[in-house]
Amino acid sequence: MWEVLALRYARHDRTAQSNFMMPVPDPHDAMPMDYFVWLLRGPEGRLVLVDTGFSEETAAKRGRTILRPVGDCLRAIGVDPAAIQDVVVTHLHYDHAGNLDLFPNARFHIQDNEVSFATGRHMCSHCLRHPFEVQDVVRLIRAVYADRVVFHDGEGEVAPGVTLHGVGGHSGGLQMVRIATARGPLVIAGDASHYYANMARENPFPIVFDLGAMVQGWRRARALAGGDESLVIPGHDPLVRIRFPAEPGNPEATRLDLPPYS
């Protein structure tokens, strides 16, 4: 079985309407966004990282607040980034695929169609390329040429108990991660649902490439979790840190494999 830690590295203050496509009752209410990477600790000390966050340079460019750089988040729980051998990139948006150079010994797991999307004709449109940072995409392509990228076509496996599931929607090749844990099959939905409320209300986050695929992705996440929505983890919701216990001695690290408080 695997342990799963959500590591918060940044945040952004914003209003509720910024996080939904359709109108909400109180659009001006505060609804901040947290930014996470996820560390999976498996049998015999195996480590898998899900997503790589963004750099301080990108934070300044996009008006985000870094609380602790991703490398420092990992070191705070005793993990040397150079020791990580497998990194899952759920998609290539700036907040999920920066800092690739922090992981010189890792293989990067990504969907075929996400790389095609991020390097193809859709990037000729500003509205579609806005969530990407070109230097992040270039680093991924350099990793391809260095034989350090593992491509997946829909379903895939990173390690026993860690599987990948392509759903698209938010980005052309978004993938979710399913992890075998002591409390059941945990699903890192990531940006298939930024907040619990996106999925619960069926009101999508407004950055979306394929709306139909996003809606089907919510259903897929529930199914992968065996119908237990407490096992579906959204990509950016501050409620994650309220619902689950912190790693002892590190309040920015949250243990998702342990039972939620409620």
What are these regions (language model features)?
Residues R64, R68, D72, M176-S262:
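Cap/insert and terminal regions of metallo-dependent hydrolase folds
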Residues R68-V79, A83, N113-G166, A213-E229:
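Metallo-beta-lactamase
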Residues Y9-A10, T52-F54, L92, N113-E114, ...:
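Active-site metal-binding loops of divalent metal-dependent hydrolases
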Residues V4, L40, D51, I84, ...:
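Divalent metal-coordination and catalytic microenvironments
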Residues E3-A6, V37-G42, V48, D153-A182:
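Core dinuclear metal-dependent hydrolase active-site scaffold
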Residues R64-I110:
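Active-site metal-binding motif and surrounding structural segment of the metallo-beta-lactamase
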Residues M1-A30, G156, G249, L258-S262:
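Basic, amphipathic N-terminal segments that precede the first structured/catalytic domain
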Residues Y9-A76, M176-G190:
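Conserved beta-strand hairpin/beta-sheet module of binuclear metal-dependent hydrolase folds
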